[in-house]
Structures are given as C-alpha cells and as structure tokens.
UniProtKB/Swiss-Prot annotation:
Coiled coil: none annotated. It holds the Pfam family His_biosynth. This is Imidazole glycerol phosphate synthase subunit HisF. The keyword Lipid biosynthesis does not apply. Heterodimer of HisH and HisF. One of its GO terms (cellular component) is cytoplasm. It is found in: Cytoplasm. IGPS catalyzes the conversion of PRFAR and glutamine to IGP, AICAR and glutamate. The HisF subunit catalyzes the cyclization activity that produces IGP and AICAR from PRFAR using the ammonia provided by the HisH subunit. Belongs to the HisA/HisF family. The gene is hisF. Keywords: Amino-acid biosynthesis, Cytoplasm, Histidine biosynthesis, Lyase. The active site is at D11, D130. It comes from Rhodopseudomonas palustris (strain HaA2).
Amino acid sequence: MFKVRVIPCLDVKDGRVVKGVNFVDLRDAGDPVEAAIAYDAAGADELCFLDITATHENRGIMLDVVRRTAEACFMPVTVGGGVRTVDDIKTLLRSGADKVSINSAAVARREFVKEAAEKFGDQCIVVAIDAKRVPGRDRWEIFTHGGRKGTGIDAIEFAQEVVSLGAGEILLTSMDRDGTRSGFDLPLTRAIADSIQVPVIASGGVGNLDHLVDGIRDGHATAVLAASIFHFGEYTIRQAKDHMVRCGLPMRLDP
C-alpha cells in the first residue's frame, strides 16, 4: 500500500514565506531556505515551494532561492509559480527541483502539459488547481493568477483533461478553505480524486491533525499539504505523522 505523504507548503512572496487567508491578507512566516532546512530535518516527506505572485507580476521564478532550498534539502522539492514554458521547467529542474508545478499556464494552454510531460516525464509534472465552489451548486470553478482571475472552467473536467495529457499529480487547493483552518473541502477533494488515476495532494484549510486524516480517509487524497499549522509551531511534522499512524494510515516514519 502507498505511504501517505505529509507536505509542508512554502508560499513565497518577495523572498519571504507568507501565509494568507483566502489568498489575501498575507502574514510573514520567515525565510524560505531556513524553513526548508527545518522541515527536512523534521522528517517532511516532500516540500512544496510556490512563488505565489510570480505569474501575477509577470516575472520569473526566484531561482537563487530555489537553488539554495534544493541544496539544503534531501527530501523531494516541488516548485511552482510563473512556470510558462518548457525552458522554465528545464531551468527549475537544473536548479534542483524534483517536480515542477504548473498552474495558470496549464489553464491558458492545455497542450503545454502534454509538451512538458513528453519532454521531462509525467513523474515530475504537477498541475496545480485552485478551485472555488460555485454558489448553490455542487460544482467548482478554476481560478488562476494566484486566485485573482476566474475562468468559468469546471475543476473536475479540467483535472481529467490534464491527466489525459500527461500530468502526473494534481495539487488541489480549495480557495474557499485556504487559510481558514476549517478543514479541507472534502467533497471537492473526493470528487477529483475519484475521477482521475494519479495522486491528488489535498490543500487548503488544515487547522488540526484530524483534518489531515480526513483528507486521506474522506477526501481520498494520497497526500496532504499544510502551511500555518507547521509554520507557526502549533504542530510538528512528527506529531502529524504519529497522529495519522494512530488513526491507521500508512506513514513513513524516520527512526
């Protein structure tokens, strides 16, 4: 059976880790490289590094931070933000990223996912989906550009399409739950996880350790991502994993 992954997320703006509520009201949470080193030592299964304003501000990835983060960490690192071309992916992989997350560019041009997967392999291509529930309906709309731009695109249909084009993993964030500490959007997570055949990382809304368990058990995700509960010292990675083991989930535990 697969091992459940616990993934801290470093949302970075202007070279600092930040944490917001519903993608706004950003709060400083420290230096990204220092945070990465701490999470690596704490036993995180992976690290997700997202330059959250790169696409919106039309600028490139902070490659120096990416390089220093990758050099400091032994765990796999996924990097995203402002990834628009095959050359962007190549540069990130050469800088030390293990996987690259594509968001707005995948929505704008689906074939980009296919090109990337064919060139680098689907194992390192992650498509990030930021979704928001359509009021009064059991449907979710995709937003792009750091959650600033609605698209009218159905999140479930989009997930199925990008997987058919070669996406090896989906990083799914509920904009409604992001930063609220009220738990994952389980109907959204479950709907997408049950509709595709690749791993789904649940993101957005973790406020306690039971929420992590819920994402796997009820959301059918294969990995869970969290930020604020780890960044501000409320829980450690080991506490999270120990709790999940007690709840019967298969985890990788360091000695």
